[in-house]
């Protein structure tokens, strides 16, 4: 199997874009749009609106008959005022990606892009289904986003 080529420049740009416009739990509309648009462009079957702002991209590998694998990233920010002075500092008052979910989402997008490219070139072994899962509202507590996403993903994609 070939090694994936990660688009590090795009990953950096996605992270900075998300960092500048952080969204709290169940408000991840801008992030959802970026993720779903990108996954669609890379050939994923995209499901949006799961647990309000969750996104899942489905990639069929080979015949699709085989194991199912899910990879998950969180998307939400925290209600914190950013004062880092960085060029990509939050532009939204009282909201910040202090938890690193902008990085988590950008890394997962980079992996999704690389895996789709490898799949299109016939470089992924075997047969099965890959689900790339972008979960909203991880920071809300009590498992709100995770539990809602789990119910929706399992019922929608099984």
Regions found by a protein language model. Name each.
Residues 1-97, 106-129:
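Acidic/His- and Gly-rich active-site-bordering loop/insert found
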Residues 103-158:
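Acidic/histidine-rich catalytic neighborhood of metal-dependent amide-processing enzymes
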Residues 99-101:
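Membrane-interface loop-to-helix entry segments
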